[in-house]
Design a protein with these regions (language model features):
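General small-molecule cofactor/ligand-binding pocket signal
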Residues: 37-39, 89-93, 141-143
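A short acidic, glycine-rich active-site loop
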Residues: 56-76
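Short secondary-structure boundary segments
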Residues: 40, 114-116, 144-145
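Short, acidic/small-residue loops that bind anionic groups at enzyme active sites
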Residues: 135-145
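Short beta->alpha linker loops
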Residues: 42, 73, 92-96
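Structural beta-alpha unit
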Residues: 1-4, 17, 79-111
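Glycine-rich, Arg-bearing micro-motifs that act as flexible, cationic patches
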Residues: 110-135
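Small/aliphatic-rich secondary-structure junction motif
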Residues: 2-60, 104
Length: 145
């Protein structure tokens, strides 16, 4: 089987906006014969992430155990989405979301991401989306909510 001609990167933060972007990226990928890669960036501490995810059970151990548990948790969630949408690859990163998305975008043909903002230009697009648009080396498709 020939490898896909195009490849799309879809940043996922598990919000409804990012999942809508994934659905749209999937439709486009099917039409174009492109591959999908899902990326999740953990921007906050693992302790805060565990609490935000309602997974306080993961906090019973040293911080390395918490980090490993959260990484595993997000990897499982990404794998589930990848299976559902036929993504070829999943990636996990830690750091500032916009910076990690731009770094990961190199080598892809398109980044497809959601828009969750509320007011003003950065609010309209969302701060992360605006930063990615301003600095990304490849085209970015922004899917409105």
């Amino acid at each position: 089987m020939a490898s896909p001609e195009f490849s799309f990167l879809v940043p996922i933060d598990f919000s409804s906006a990012s999942q809508k972007a994934l659905r749209e990226a999937h439709k486009l990928a099917v039409r174009m014969g492109a591959s999908l890669t899902l990326l999740h960036v953990r921007p906050m501490s693992d302790v805060r992430a565990a609490i935000a995810e309602g997974r306080e059970d993961l906090l019973k151990g040293p911080s390395r155990s918490i980090a490993a548990a959260m990484k595993s948790h997000y990897a499982e969630r990404l794998a589930s989405l990848a299976e559902r949408f036929g993504a070829a690859e999943t990636r996990l990163a830690s750091g500032r979301a916009s910076r990690e998305i731009v770094r990961a975008a190199k080598g892809f043909d398109l980044v497809v991401m959601g828009r969750t903002g509320r007011g003003g230009l950065s609010g309209f697009l969302g701060g992360t989306t605006q930063k990615v648009l301003a600095t990304c080396p490849v085209p970015v498709a922004v899917v409105p909510v």
